[in-house]
Design a protein with these regions (language model features):
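Short helix/turn-capping signatures at newly exposed starts of structured segments
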Residues: 1-101, 129-130
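Glycine-rich, aromatic-bearing surface loops/beta-hairpins
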Residues: 110-130
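Broad, structure-driven detector of short, well-ordered beta-strand segments within folded domains
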Residues: 60-66, 102-106, 110-117
């Protein structure tokens, strides 16, 4: 895939990640009803959290909720081959905040995340609102 197509594809993934923010879990389920998804609830002592994982192209979109409102979206890339191109796209499109280690988007933030406990070392891009 050439650079222009890669950037366009990544831009679309970011758009999908942004589209879930501020939505309820039921609204997100309706928006992505034709996609493969996993809905889960994590319970431990007094702590409870809910999440939705949705397969989108070559990525998995994870929606993180607080009071049933998605406040964070995480795009796990299934293939890290093009991550350099995606980082270059972010560097050329968004201002980078070195102090907080994140890109500043028009209405939020974007962070590159590599989980320490993921044996596959899948890269993820995390979006949050301002």
């Amino acid at each position: 895939m050439d650079t222009l197509k890669l950037h366009s594809h990544f831009e679309n993934l970011l758009y999908v990640g942004r589209s879930v923010l501020t939505n309820t879990s039921s609204r997100i389920q309706r928006l992505f009803f034709k996609k493969e998804m996993c809905i889960y609830e994590y319970l431990f002592k007094e702590e409870a959290s809910k999440g939705i994982e949705i397969v989108v192209d070559n990525a998995v979109l994870v929606c993180v909720f607080e009071n049933d409102i998605c406040n964070k979206s995480i795009l796990y890339l299934n293939d890290s081959t093009n991550v350099t191109s995606y980082i270059n796209y972010c560097n050329s499109t968004f201002e980078y905040d070195k102090l907080r280690d994140r890109w500043i988007m028009p209405d939020g933030y974007l962070t590159l995340f590599i989980p320490n406990d993921d044996f596959e070392k899948r890269f993820a891009f995390v979006q949050t609102l301002v």
